[in-house]
Design a protein with these regions (language model features):
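Alpha-helical transmembrane segments of multi-pass membrane proteins predominantly involved
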Residues: 1-172
């Protein structure tokens, strides 16, 4: 998760390099999307750690088998971090890269894309782990409030990815 924060900070810095009014809206969109995905992912990680006593990424192995909601939610968070369309994480990066290109910072946009591709490899490794079968981990239970919180966050990531202009216009 720390590397995710560093990569996201790079996109925010690209936007600040452009320093245009419109770009600030995209920074807010990016930070909002990233924050929602990070809060959900950390909430899931914390729940898994608490209920399984596994403190590493291997604790995610088989998550899809032991709690479908947590597994699907973590996969959506990882795909959003990776910037895979149609999730909000894609548009959060896309809008900033378009602004960079528009203001002749194409080389920085290319670096941003390359970093995103490299980071996607790590997210895809986590996703593969989530989908593997592991019968040693107990079933993970959630309270109704925790379930609602995770579902609301995932709905935000999907809807604001399918209709980013709605969120962007609200931020203006």
């Amino acid at each position: 998760m720390a590397y995710t924060g560093i990569a996201n900070a790079g996109f925010v810095l690209i936007a600040y390099l452009v320093l245009q009014h419109e770009t600030y809206v995209y920074v807010i969109y990016n930070l909002t999307v990233y924050s929602v995905a990070a809060i959900i992912a950390l909430s899931i990680y914390s729940t898994v750690k608490t209920q399984t006593n596994i403190d590493t990424i291997s604790g995610m192995t088989g998550l899809l088998t032991h709690n479908k909601l947590l597994g699907v939610a973590m996969i959506i968070c990882m795909l959003s971090f990776a910037g895979i369309p149609p999730l909000a994480g894609f548009f959060a990066k896309y809008f900033i890269l378009v602004e960079a290109i528009k203001y002749d910072y194409t080389w920085i946009a290319v670096v941003g894309v390359l970093v995103s591709v490299l980071a996607a490899y790590n997210y895809l490794r986590i996703i593969a782990s989530i989908g593997q079968r592991d019968d040693t981990i107990p079933t993970i239970s959630l309270s109704l409030i925790h379930r609602a919180f995770i579902i609301a966050g995932i709905v935000f990531l999907v809807v604001s990815g399918l209709m980013p202009e709605v969120v962007i216009s609200w931020l203006r």
